[in-house]
C-alpha cells in the first residue's frame, strides 16, 4: 500500500539510479600515506596506459573537471553536477565504501589477516566442521592461487582458503569436484565461525571455479556468493525500504549489505550484464525509489590483476553504455555515477588504493550542471537520495544532502 502511495506522489526524481564503477578512484586521499597509497590514481593511470582515454559521455558530465585525466577535457558547461568525495571511514574496501554511501561511518577498520593468514585454531575448526582438508591460507590473487593449488584441490577435494588486503576469508573449490552447494555449505560454516570477535571478517566469499588444469582454470563469477556482516545500524536503504520505496539492487549490492534494506536483487556475471539489467529496469520498470548497481569487473578483472590497458578499455566500454542509458532517461530520472575506492592498476601490489571517488549527477531535466565543492564523505549520496524522497535520516548516519541539484 505504501509503495502504491509513493508512486502516486510527485518527487523531484521518481527513480534514482546509483551506479558504482567498482574501484574507479580519481586520486589519492589526503591520508593516503597512512595506507601506503601515495601517488595512486586509478582513472589517470589507466588513461595514461593507452595514451588518451575516450569517454565522451562522462567527459560531457564534467569528469575532466575533477582531475587531470589524459584524453578527458575540462568542459565550461558540464551537463551534470560533478564533484569528488572523500572517504570518512577508516578503510578502502568494498563494504566500507558502499556502507558509507548509505550513511555508515566505519570508525574501526575491519580485521585483516593479510600478513599472517588465518589462525591455526580457526583453520582446524573450519576443517573439522566442513569435513574437508584446507590448503593455502595466505594472501593471494584469486587467479594466481588457482594456478598454484587448483589441481591439488581437485585431486583431494580439499578447500583453498585465502585472503587479501580486504577483510575477507575466501574459499575456492571446483564446481564439478566439490560442487556448488557443498561450497556454499562450507562458506556458511566459515561465516558462523568468523562471527567470533577474534576471527571476525567483513565477508566470507565463495569462489567456485572450473577447468581441467592450471592453464585453463577460471572463476565462475555468476556463482560467486558473498556472506557479509550486516551493518550494525539502519542505513539509508533501510529507511527507504521501511517507508515503502523500492530498493532494487543489481550486482553484488545485496551481498554487501547482507540483504538489509533490499526489496529486490539481480545478480550479474559482468559489467555488460550489469548494464543490460540496469537499462532494462530504466526502460521497462516503473518504480519510485532507487536502483543501486555495482559493476565489479573494473576491480576484479583489471585493478587487482594490474591490467591498466584492460581497465582503460573497460572504462571506455562503460561510457558507451552510459550514453545508451542517458538516451532512455525520463525527465524525472536521476543518474549518479561513482566509485567505492581506488584500485590503481599501475600501483605496487595487487590491492585497493585509498582514493577519492568521482560523483557525476545527471538528469535530462537539468538546465545546466556545474562543479560542486569536494564532499567530505561518500555519505552525501544516500543523504541526497533521502532528501529527494522527503525522508529524515537517523542521527548516527553521516553526510549532508547536495541541495544544489534540487535548485
What positions do the PLM features span?
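Feature captures the catalytic ectodomains and active-site-proximal regions of enzymes
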Residues: 1-407
Amino acid at each position: 500500500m505504501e509503495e502504491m502511495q509513493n508512486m502516486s506522489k510527485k518527487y523531484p526524481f521518481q527513480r534514482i539510479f546509483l551506479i558504482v564503477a567498482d574501484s574507479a578512484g580519481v586520486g589519492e586521499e589526503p591520508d593516503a600515506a597512512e595506507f601506503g597509497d601515495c601517488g595512486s590514481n586509478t582513472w589517470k593511470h589507466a588513461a595514461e596506459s593507452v595514451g588518451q582515454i575516450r569517454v565522451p559521455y562522462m567527459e560531457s558530465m564534467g569528469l575532466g573537471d575533477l582531475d587531470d585525466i589524459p584524453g578527458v577535457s575540462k568542459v565550461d558547461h558540464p551537463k551534470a553536477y560533478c564533484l569528488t568525495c572523500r572517504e570518512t571511514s577508516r578503510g578502502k574496501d568494498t563494504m566500507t565504501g558502499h556502507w558509507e554511501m548509505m550513511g555508515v561511518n566505519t570508525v574501526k577498520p575491519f580485521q585483516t589477516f593479510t600478513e599472517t593468514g588465518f589462525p591455526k585454531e580457526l583453520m582446524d575448526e573450519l576443517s573439522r566442521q566442513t569435513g574437508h582438508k584446507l590448503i593455502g591460507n595466505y594472501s593471494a590473487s584469486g587467479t594466481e592461487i588457482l594456478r598454484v593449488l587448483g589441481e591439488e584441490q581437485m585431486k583431494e577435494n580439499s578447500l583453498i582458503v585465502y585472503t587479501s588486503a580486504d577483510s575477507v576469508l575466501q574459499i575456492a573449490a571446483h564446481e564439478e569436484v566439490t560442487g556448488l552447494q557443498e561450497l556454499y555449505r562450507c562458506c556458511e560454516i566459515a561465516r558462523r565461525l568468523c562471527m567470533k570477535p577474534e576471527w571476525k571478517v567483513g565477508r566470507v566469499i565463495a569462489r567456485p571455479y572450473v577447468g581441467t588444469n592450471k592453464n585453463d582454470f577460471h572463476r565462475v563469477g555468476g556463482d560467486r556468493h558473498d556472506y557479509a556482516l550486516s551493518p550494525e545500524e539502519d542505513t539509508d536503504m533501510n529507511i527507504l525500504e521501511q517507508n515503502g520505496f523500492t530498493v532494487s539492487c543489481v550486482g553484488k549490492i545485496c551481498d554487501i549489505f547482507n540483504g538489509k534494506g533490499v526489496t529486490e536483487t539481480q545478480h550479474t556475471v559482468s559489467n555488460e550484464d550489469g548494464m543490460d539489467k540496469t537499462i532494462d529496469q530504466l526502460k521497462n520498470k516503473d518504480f519510485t525509489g532507487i536502483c543501486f548497481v555495482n559493476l565489479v569487473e573494473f576491480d576484479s578483472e583489471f585493478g587487482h590483476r594490474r591490467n591498466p590497458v584492460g581497465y582503460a578499455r573497460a572504462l571506455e566500454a562503460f561510457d558507451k553504455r552510459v550514453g545508451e542509458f542517458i538516451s532512455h532517461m525520463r525527465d524525472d530520472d536521476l543518474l549518479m555515477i561513482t566509485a567505492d575506492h581506488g584500485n590503481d592498476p599501475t600501483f605496487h601490489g595487487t590491492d585497493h588504493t585509498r582514493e577519492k571517488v568521482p560523483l557525476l549527477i545527471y538528469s535530462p531535466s537539468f538546465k545546466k550542471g556545474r562543479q560542486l565543492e569536494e564532499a567530505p564523505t561518500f555519505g552525501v549520496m544516500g543523504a541526497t537520495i533521502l532528501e529527494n524522497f522527503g525522508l529524515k535520516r537517523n542521527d548516527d548516519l553521516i553526510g549532508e544532502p547536495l541541495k544544489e541539484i534540487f535548485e
